[in-house]
């Protein structure tokens, strides 16, 4: 179990993201699409085109963590937003 500090914000990147991206690519998406600093300690959540994969990017103060979850059946429900983010 990974515990997040209290006050940590979770940013959901609306739409779909290329799941081939790794640490640097997803950090760049957080900077460009959300105008957010990926090294601020907040959590950034990305969804793939098919909707069956999520990736979570988090800077824990020592380095970036990249977590992934793939569903064997079904899809993650995802918000739609024109600005690229949902709060």
Each language-model region and where it sits:
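Polybasic/polar functional segments that serve as interface/processing modules
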Residues: 1-87
């Amino acid at each position: 179990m990974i515990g997040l500090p209290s006050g940590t914000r979770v940013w959901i990147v609306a739409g779909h993201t290329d799941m081939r991206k790794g640490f640097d690519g997803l950090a760049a998406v957080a900077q460009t699409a959300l105008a957010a600093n990926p090294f601020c300690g907040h959590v950034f959540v990305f969804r793939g085109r098919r909707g069956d994969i999520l990736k979570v990017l988090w800077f824990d103060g020592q380095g970036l963590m990249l977590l992934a979850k793939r569903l064997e059946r079904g899809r993650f429900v995802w918000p739609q937003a024109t600005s690229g983010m949902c709060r």
